């Protein structure tokens, strides 16, 4: 429920944010020039200023209604005030003007960067290199209400007298009659190739793409509740990055280019360096700014009438027949090698994170099997499973009766601490062979007999038979002593168990002392000869306890060793059959866990506990289900089948997504790495190729007759 609430809240927040962005964008579309003066200060328009502006606009409308010298009325200009006109923008900027052929008394067009503004004509004389300007919004062009300290309030009378004066029509020029004429041929938008030169190199977009790769990686290791949000954010970042790299520029972002015709001239002193010479060329009063690599080729157009395309900031984009930034980008594309390097490095980073942080074996196997078309196999007998033809990637469901495998030292198991030790029920031996018998051990029987004989004599029960009278036994117990009424039996059982010379050394020494014998061999001979029959030994309680502990300590190694040996003897299944192994160590049997692990029992109890486990797990029902991850046959002919638990829907998508991300990162690293290297090599030679192209166009090499002959 909380997830749904969070989702709805996030959806509402995104909707509100999208609505606000649309509103801001629509407002900026209505005022597209606002972004050009983002650093301008603002204030409110005073009532006196508004009255002066209204009077000026009224007088301007009257002037525009007067027919020009050709008899035609001037084109109407909508300079009506609107709701945004109360905000005054104050900035310091250069003003550029162009002349046009028209009957309009105000024949000049004024620009602040790429934004055309309406400047009252009587203020032209106050234009400087840097101007303090105040603007207000109108329905069409921004209106200048103050220029370098001169305001409309002070010059309303001058405005009316100037606006009513007839102005002769001339050709378009920069300085009118005082300068050479410049013809404005056309005003166009820059081409995509010209825009590419001022477009960012795509580093920000490359970083967005790398960030989306990282978010896709984190989708694989985060809880399911966060995956949709991370995946959605990653898709948005990836889309934004790809859109920034490959989307065509918006029409509003294309700058205006003025196509002019005139005579460029160089104004400067002798002795100037190359950089100064390229920056002192003017077209009328327009100081042209050329690309640095054009410096050797612009001299031939000086003093001649030439077509020149420039931005409003006076940067030249085309001159004459051959010099063209558009043709440069078209014939010698820009090589953005750095963004390819960033994407390749980000792809390698995510690739290494996948290799070191996420197990890739199962996702790759599952994806390959899914692509090949895996089958589902169900089997209840060994023959049925053998005939099914199991392959890696198949879904396997089997049930039957088998034996839990015995874990041996040096073998790998996914389950590190099985409750059924030494049995491992995450590995099932399944075949048609007859079940193995329960393990038996003669040494364990001998150790048990010795332990029982000592316990019977040290801790007698009333119903036990004894070689001494009941009255004597009672008297001995009252005195606090302990009676061994069959000492010879203990000696014989010890000799039977501890046949080796180094076995039970401490126990043998204790029995030699109790029997007042020279050594162990002599004591055993006496016992075998029957000389110890009827010999009773009295022990103090401390000595009796010591003897009991010695017997327990001496028999423990035999029982422990025999338990391990019996377990290993079970690790020899019949040839053939199957060994079903769980990759995650899950038990395939439904048996109650023992109260304690086998090796947590005292040594004297381990054998009995082991026999109970063997009786339960050597022939036990099991159910195994999962996806086959590995199949191989060992030297014994047993087919090993590894099973991975069947993942849920979320797990399936994680497997597929892991493989897809791995392949995508590998492909991205290779492609962008190769592209970065190739683009870097081309970037190094691009400028030389452009200069060679201009050299061949402007200074063609003529082929001499001797060179054209075919030998």
Curated annotation (Swiss-Prot):
Pfam entry (one): IgaA
Keywords, ordered alphabetically: Cell inner membrane, Cell membrane, Membrane, Transmembrane, Transmembrane helix
Membrane-spanning residues: 2-22, 205-225, 226-246, 340-360, 656-676
Cytoplasmic side: 23-204, 247-339, 677-711
Gene Ontology MF terms in the entry: phosphorelay response regulator activity
Compartments, as annotated in UniProt: Cell inner membrane
GO biological process, one term: regulation of phosphorelay signal transduction system
Major subcellular location class: membrane
Membrane-topology descriptor: Multi-pass membrane protein
Periplasmic domain ranges by topology: 1, 361-655
A single Gene Ontology CC term: plasma membrane
Family under the similarity heading: Belongs to the IgaA family.
Name listed for the protein in its UniProt record: Putative membrane protein IgaA homolog
Gene name in the database record: yrfF
């Amino acid at each position: 429920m909380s997830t749904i609430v969070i989702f709805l809240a996030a959806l509402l927040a995104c909707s509100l944010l999208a609505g606000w962005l649309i509103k801001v964008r629509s407002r900026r579309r209505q005022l597209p020039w606002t972004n050009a003066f983002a650093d301008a200060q603002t204030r409110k328009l005073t009532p006196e200023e508004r009255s002066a502006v209204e009077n000026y606009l009224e007088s301007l409308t009257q002037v525009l209604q007067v027919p020009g010298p050709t008899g035609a009325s001037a084109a109407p200009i909508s300079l009506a005030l609107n709701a945004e006109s109360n905000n005054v923008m104050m900035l310091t900027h250069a003003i550029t003007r162009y002349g046009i052929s028209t009957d309009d008394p105000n024949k000049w067009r004024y620009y602040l960067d790429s934004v055309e503004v309406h400047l009252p004509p009587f203020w032209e004389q106050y234009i400087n290199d840097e101007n303090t300007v105040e603007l207000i919004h109108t329905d069409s062009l921004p209106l200048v209400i103050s220029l370098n300290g001169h305001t409309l309030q002070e010059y309303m009378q001058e405005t009316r007298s100037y606006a009513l004066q007839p102005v002769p029509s001339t050709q378009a020029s920069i300085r009118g009659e005082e300068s050479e004429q410049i013809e404005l041929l056309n005003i166009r938008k820059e081409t995509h190739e010209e825009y590419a030169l001022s477009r960012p190199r795509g580093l920000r977009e490359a970083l967005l793409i790398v960030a989306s790769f990282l978010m896709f990686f984190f989708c694989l290791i985060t809880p399911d509740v966060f995956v949709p949000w991370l995946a959605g954010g990653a898709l948005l970042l990836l889309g934004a990055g790809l859109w920034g790299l490959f989307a065509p520029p918006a029409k509003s972002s294309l700058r205006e280019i003025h196509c002019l015709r005139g005579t460029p001239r160089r104004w400067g002193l002798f002795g100037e360096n190359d950089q100064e010479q390229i920056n002192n060329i003017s077209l009328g009063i327009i100081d042209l700014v050329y690309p640095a690599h054009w410096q050797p080729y612009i001299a031939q157009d000086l003093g001649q009438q030439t077509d020149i395309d420039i931005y409003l900031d006076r940067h030249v984009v085309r001159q004459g027949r051959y010099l063209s930034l558009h043709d440069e980008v078209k014939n010698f594309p820009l090589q953005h090698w750095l963004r390819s390097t960033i994407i390749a490095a980000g792809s390698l980073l995510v690739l290494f994170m996948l290799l070191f942080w996420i197990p890739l074996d199962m996702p790759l196997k599952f994806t390959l099997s899914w692509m090949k078309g895996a089958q589902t196999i169900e089997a209840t007998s060994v023959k049925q499973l053998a005939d099914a033809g199991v392959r890696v990637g198949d879904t396997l469901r089997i049930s039957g009766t088998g034996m839990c495998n015995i874990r041996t030292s040096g073998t790998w198991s996914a389950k590190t601490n099985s409750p059924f030790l030494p049995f491992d029920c995450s590995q099932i031996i399944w075949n048609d062979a007859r079940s193995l018998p329960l393990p038996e051990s003669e040494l364990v029987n001998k150790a048990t007999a010795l332990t029982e004989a000592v316990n019977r004599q040290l801790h007698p029960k009333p119903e036990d038979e004894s070689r001494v009278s009941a009255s004597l036994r009672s008297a001995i117990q009252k005195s606090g002593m302990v009676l061994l009424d069959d000492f010879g039996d203990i000696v014989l059982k010890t000799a039977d168990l501890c046949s080796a010379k180094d076995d039970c050394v401490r126990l043998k020494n204790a029995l030699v002392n109790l029997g007042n014998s020279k050594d162990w061999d002599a004591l055993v001979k006496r016992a075998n000869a029957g000389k110890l029959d009827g010999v009773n030994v009295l022990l103090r309680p401390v000595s009796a306890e010591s003897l009991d502990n010695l017997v327990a300590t001496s028999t423990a190694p035999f029982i422990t060793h025999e338990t391990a040996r019996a377990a290993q003897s079970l690790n020899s299944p019949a040839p053939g059959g199957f060994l079903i192994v769980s990759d995650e160590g899950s038990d395939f049997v439904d048996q109650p866990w023992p109260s304690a692990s086998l090796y947590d029992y005292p040594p004297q109890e381990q054998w009995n506990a082991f026999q109970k486990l063997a009786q339960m797990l050597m022939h036990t029902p099991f159910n195994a289900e999962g996806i086959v991850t590995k199949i191989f046959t060992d030297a014994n002919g047993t087919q090993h089948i590894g099973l991975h638990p069947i993942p849920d829907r979320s797990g399936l998508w994680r497997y597929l997504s892991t493989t897809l991300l791995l392949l995508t990162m590998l492909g991205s690293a290779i492609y962008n790495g190769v592209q970065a290297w190739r683009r870097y090599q081309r970037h190094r030679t691009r400028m030389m190729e452009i200069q060679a192209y201009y050299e061949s166009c402007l200074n063609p090499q003529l082929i001499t007759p001797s060179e054209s002959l075919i030998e």
